[in-house]
Design a protein with these regions (language model features):
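Basic/polar, cationic surfaces and motifs that engage anionic cell-wall
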Residues: 1-12, 50-54, 70-75, 80-145
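Short, conserved "active-site rim" segments that organize catalytic pockets and cofactor/ligand binding
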Residues: 1-61
C-alpha cells in the first residue's frame, strides 16, 4: 500500500439541479486531456452523493488524480455539489453528506492515522474547493505533530 500523508476533500462543482455520481465523474475525467494524454478515469477514491451514499472511484491502492503534486501520497474524497443555483462556489453539503463525509473521513483516519485532513484549497490556494474548512471541521482527527 502507498504511504498516505493526506486525505484531500473536494467538491464536484455542480449546481443543485445537477448530479455527479462516480460513474459520471469517471466519464468526465476520461474526456479530459492533459499534455496530449487522456485521463484514465475518475481521479477521486470516493464520491459522497447528496443522499449520503458513498460511491467508490479509484481503488485505494492506486494513486488518485485530484490534486497536482499530491496524488501519490493522498486519498481524494469528493462530495456532490459545491455550487449554488446561481453557480457561486458555496458549501452545499446536505446533512446526509455531512454525516457520510464524517464517517468516511473517520474510517480513512483509522487506516491512515498520520494523514492530515485538508481541503483542496489548502494545497492549491487558487481553488475554493471544497467550499468549507476541512482542517477545522475534522480538527479532532488531525494527527498530533
Amino acid at each position: 500500500m502507498r504511504k498516505i500523508t493526506l486525505i484531500v476533500i473536494h467538491c464536484s462543482a455542480v449546481r443543485p439541479n445537477q448530479t455527479s455520481s462516480a460513474a459520471q465523474i469517471d466519464e468526465w475525467h476520461k474526456e479530459r486531456v492533459t499534455h496530449g494524454i487522456h485521463w484514465k478515469g475518475i481521479g477521486y477514491h470516493y464520491v459522497v452523493r447528496r443522499d449520503g451514499t458513498v460511491e467508490i472511484g479509484r481503488h485505494l491502492a492506486d494513486p488518485g488524480a485530484h490534486c497536482v503534486g499530491h496524488n501519490r501520497h493522498s486519498i481524494g474524497i469528493c462530495y456532490e455539489g459545491g455550487l449554488n443555483a446561481e453557480g457561486l462556489e458555496v458549501d452545499t453539503r446536505t446533512p446526509e453528506q455531512v454525516r457520510a463525509l464524517r464517517e468516511l473521513v473517520e474510517k480513512m483516519h483509522t487506516y491512515f492515522p498520520e494523514a492530515l485532513i485538508v481541503g483542496h484549497h489548502d494545497l492549491n490556494p487558487s481553488k475554493t474547493c471544497p467550499c468549507f474548512d476541512a482542517v477545522h471541521e475534522y480538527w479532532d482527527l488531525q494527527p498530533v505533530r
